Design a protein with these regions (language model features):
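Domain-level signal for soluble alpha/beta catalytic cores
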Residues: 1-135
Length: 135
């Protein structure tokens, strides 16, 4: 099982739990990796030293929203069940990070121990193609 979690700027889950507590509470022999999903490059950078000490392969799926830590969907999407909500691309923006810059960032994280690599919101095929060359 590869476990995916979302982290906030404070290196905790949105529920306020610490990652180490989650690992201690739920890890079992079927865990083969831990992925930090839909997090900004800044959050990955800020938390990477902590995760390099894990005794478990880890990595990330970076989002390229224009802001570091999006607020919960409910704060910008007030649509009712029969309405169209706010487009997250408009509400959150998108950063202009080239595939080469994404590669450099990902390479730094690999050097810190990340082994599971990927992209999430606003990453494009060219970003993934570029990091696919990492060994």
């Amino acid at each position: 099982v590869v476990v995916g979690i979302h982290l906030k700027k404070n290196c905790k889950l949105p529920s306020g739990e610490n990652v180490q507590n989650i690992i201690e509470k739920f890890q079992c022999n079927s865990w083969i990796g831990l992925v930090f999903a839909c997090v900004s490059p800044e959050i990955v950078e800020r938390t990477s030293d902590f995760f390099s000490d894990l005794k478990l392969p880890f990595g990330f799926k970076v989002n390229l929203w224009g802001i570091e830590e999006p607020t919960p969907v409910q704060t910008f999407n007030s649509a009712k069940y029969n309405e169209i909500g706010t487009n997250p691309n408009i509400a959150l923006g998108s950063r202009n990070l080239s595939a080469k810059e994404f590669y450099k960032f990902t390479k730094r994280m690999v050097e810190k121990g990340a082994r599971i690599l990927g992209g999430c919101c606003e990453t494009k095929p060219e970003h993934i193609k570029e990091i696919s060359t990492l060994k």
